[in-house]
């Protein structure tokens, strides 16, 4: 399972800077989409081929009311459920009362914590270690988050406590290294996860109806094969069958057995939600139609997009809304969810079951789109047609040339395009190619990623050896050139 690391510390110690450094937020895929908020508190990060989740828990002021009063409930919960904590302190400011309170809280929870002394670019690291040694959390790891100093050593220590069994074993984001023979029909890339059917994570903000939807999907006319507790913080993996198709629901709210179902205020868990997204094949994102699109929805959708999961959106509590309210909500969806316009949107009532059955068709189509592979000839043909309709722009008087394309991975589909001057391809043209591939290949519910590779000169670095005749000719030319230069000098005298 993907490890979760929480960033903890008082305000202005550099947590956001470190978060951006680890998740590469400014360069993230999600930043290229209009309408998507970039102010996120959690994100996916990679280091030396390993994937992990980072959570910024927010600042802790540590006044007389104490840590529990000043930390938001979600921050405390994130610390409790995280696999490890990076506790940031400010080397320039020195140790404060707030630092001592946070350290005491972490010691009481017996949480695996790493003390991180930030802003050591102008401070002696040894002095910083000595300054914060009374906190009782071991030697501080010195870093300068703004400049990237010490980050590799910090990650080596923090990630070194986790086994190297990341998500690739689940068949996620797998490369499509086997070439499809020319003329073959597109095929699905099988993965170990298919044994229990399509894994579906139902996520969303608190009290949007996730529990009701889970109960509805596991309700009448469904056969629950068995209930099995997952290994990650009480998340439940529930395989079930519908119309002779196998599915596995990843339920972050716990099992609700028949006869014991009751509605209660959900305790939202960021950690469970993010890990459910990572482990799923398809995400059903539940929103409250009466509240419309809120910032928290955009944050979670941004993480889904960043991880590349197939996506289906369900607008719950649609029944009972007036026609004018429905029209307004649809307008807001079109305006604010442009960055996930590939996802099917369903208007449902989980309580009454209206529209719930249609979710399965979208789940199957999204999964099929995410794991299908196509031959190079097919992808190249689509590229050539797209270039013929709309050519890439000119750069320094030369037009960008896109030569051929092949599949570089699946779930989500990764299309690798080779050509010249590919570093100068505008984002708008990349979006044009994405839409073209989506339309021609009839892809639904999955993001597409396009990667460019520049053409390599086959003669670069190679040097032909001269023949004996060429060597003699070169010598004669050099001798003739020297004699001519000598005559010119003699005439000047």
Curated annotation (Swiss-Prot):
UniProt-annotated binding residues for GTP 2: 204-211, 251-255, 316-319
Keyword Membrane: no
Basic residues: compositionally biased ranges: 471-493
Source organism superkingdom: Bacteria
Residue ranges with Acidic residues bias: 167-184
Domain KH-like: 372-456
Coiled coil residues, start to end: none
PROSITE patterns: G_ENGA (PS51712)
Molecular function via GO: GTP binding; ribosome binding
GO biological processes: ribosome biogenesis
CDD domains for the chain: EngA1 (cd01894), EngA2 (cd01895)
Basic and acidic residues bias (residue ranges): 454-463
Keywords: GTP-binding, Nucleotide-binding, Repeat, Ribosome biogenesis
Gene3D superfamilies for this protein: 3.30.300.20, P-loop containing nucleotide triphosphate hydrolases
Residue numbers spanned by region Disordered: 166-195, 454-493
Binding positions (GTP 1): 9-16, 56-60, 118-121
Domain EngA-type G: 3-166, 198-371
Quaternary structure and partners: Associates with the 50S ribosomal subunit.
Entry similarity comment: Belongs to the TRAFAC class TrmE-Era-EngA-EngB-Septin-like GTPase superfamily. EngA (Der) GTPase family.
PANTHER family: GTPASE DER
Function: GTPase that plays an essential role in the late steps of ribosome biogenesis.
Annotated protein name in UniProt: GTPase Der
Chain's gene name: der
